[in-house]
Design a protein with these regions (language model features):
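Hydrophobic alpha-helical membrane-association signature
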Residues: 24-28, 64-68, 137, 144, ...
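Catalytic palm subdomain of template-directed nucleic-acid polymerases
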Residues: 13, 50-77, 95, 129
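Short, conserved non-catalytic motifs in the polymerase core
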Residues: 1-24, 52-58, 127, 152-159
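Short, conserved micro-motifs composed of acidic
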Residues: 2-6, 67-70, 82-115
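Non-catalytic, peripheral interaction segments enriched in hydrophobic/basic residues
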Residues: 45-46, 53, 77-97, 101, ...
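Helix/loop segments that flank and initiate small ligand/metal-binding modules
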Residues: 255-265
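Secondary-structure capping and boundary motifs in well-ordered enzyme cores
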Residues: 12-21, 38-41, 64, 109-112, ...
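Active-site palm subdomain of RNA-directed nucleic acid polymerases
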Residues: 22-53
Length: 265
């Protein structure tokens, strides 16, 4: 096999939306993830970059954070990639010893320390309770349910099975997004109540029931398991996806486990 190599100098950027663009970006951006700094993990999606810095002391955390930011900024400058400083934020995910801010800088610009940070659709808070995220997805799902309900009146609307597919499908896609990350949040009564309340709004519209009907009764009427069990089910499917290909049979198995748990209560 004859192999010929050719080097070309590129003098223009790749048009936005091109097929080749993402692949070329991944090739270039991969160098950032090869930076080796102890206690620092790189997480990236497209052009979003997250740096997770860990250390035994707060001062060491600051030192490592500034070191990695300096290295990333140097790489971006050399590769003519612009860093959006106005969009760059820092958050302290702490234990019992609380610190409100961390002193990290890029060049001469201090990075703002925030109490909540949204990354890839998930809201992280300092105490890692995920309560702000639960409130956020509950609000989004509630708005979606309200808008869809205007299109589907209780009378002269679609059949119940169609309502279930549409309303529960939309609501659950929002409520169960990225569940493996925040699944432990469902352990608190507060977060559980927020999710169950949002689910109840959807089930009221699915069943065309009176507002006085309880959430537990609506779940039985519509054959929809409690949100707490749906969170556990989705997380279990994700765990199985790490070692096997997810099929309809596997989803059916997990749903059967959910129903057994529900009926055993």
């Amino acid at each position: 096999i004859n192999i010929h190599n050719m080097t070309l100098k590129i003098s223009a950027g790749v048009p936005q939306g091109s097929v080749l663009g993402p692949h070329l970006w991944n090739i270039i951006y991969d160098e950032v993830f090869r930076l080796k700094i102890p206690g620092v993990n790189f997480i990236g999606f497209a052009d979003d970059l997250s740096l997770v810095v860990t250390a035994d002391s707060f001062s060491e955390t600051e030192r490592r954070a500034n070191e990695v930011l300096k290295a990333v900024d140097k790489w971006m400058t050399e590769n003519k990639v612009e860093l959006a400083l106005q969009k760059t934020e820092a958050i302290i995910l702490h234990g019992p010893r609380k610190r409100e801010r961390i002193n990290v800088k890029i060049r001469d610009t201090e990075i703002q320390t925030v109490k909540q940070l949204k990354y890839l659709g998930i809201i992280f808070d300092q105490n890692i309770t995920f309560t702000p995220h639960v409130k956020y997805i509950a609000s989004r799902a509630g708005d979606a349910i309200a808008k869809l309900s205007r299109l589907m009146p209780n009378t002269r609307g679609p059949y119940t099975n169609i309502r279930r597919q549409i309303l529960n499908g939309v609501a659950n896609s929002i409520l169960l997004y990225a569940v493996p990350v925040w699944k432990k949040a469902i352990r608190t009564a507060r977060n559980k109540a927020i999710l169950e309340s949002t689910q109840r709004k959807s089930l009221l519209r699915v069943s065309s029931a009176y507002r006085t009907v309880s959430g537990a009764a609506l779940q039985v009427l519509t054959a929809e398991p409690p949100m707490e069990l749906l969170v556990t089910e989705r997380a279990a499917i994700h765990e199985r996806a790490k070692v096997e290909v997810i099929t309809r049979e596997i989803r059916a198995e997990e749903r059967e486990k959910t129903m057994d748990t529900w009926q055993g209560r």
